[in-house]
């Protein structure tokens, strides 16, 4: 199922004007966030996948709930917020802050420290 969702998302992104070709990864506290990077003139966040602790399948986060405040591949910084308006099929609202290889996920009143992989 995870592979199917991943392939479906890649097809959707590839058919748009932004082509996602690379992925960045957060791991911490059982949470995994995969960020697909697309390119127009500069790198952009094209799609985000989320897996909570104990889950087997990725959840594709809708772009209308995502706010990318900072994203700089050269400086290796990312600040991203996800807002959930009471959809039980999606994760709770969260924020992810990344500086180089260190990351912090704030969700459900907890701050979870983790690693961020910028290697593409």
Question: What is the predicted role of each segment?
Answer:
Residues 4-14:
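Sec-dependent N-terminal signal peptides
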Residues 16-20:
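Sec/Tat signal peptide C-region and signal peptidase I cleavage site
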Residues 21-89, 94-120:
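Central antiparallel beta-sheet cores of small beta-barrel/beta-sandwich binding domains
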């Amino acid at each position: 199922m995870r592979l199917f969702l991943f392939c479906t998302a890649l097809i959707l992104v590839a058919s748009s004007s932004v082509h996602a070709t690379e992925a960045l990864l957060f791991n911490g506290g059982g949470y995994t966030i995969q960020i697909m990077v697309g390119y127009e003139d500069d790198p952009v966040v094209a799609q985000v996948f989320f897996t909570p602790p104990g889950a087997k399948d990725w959840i594709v986060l809708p772009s209308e709930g995502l706010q990318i405040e900072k994203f700089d591949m050269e400086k290796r910084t990312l600040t991203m917020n996800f807002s959930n308006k009471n959809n039980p099929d999606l994760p709770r609202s969260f924020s992810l802050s990344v500086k180089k290889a260190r990351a912090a996920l704030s969700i459900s009143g907890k701050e979870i420290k983790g690693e961020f992989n910028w290697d593409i």
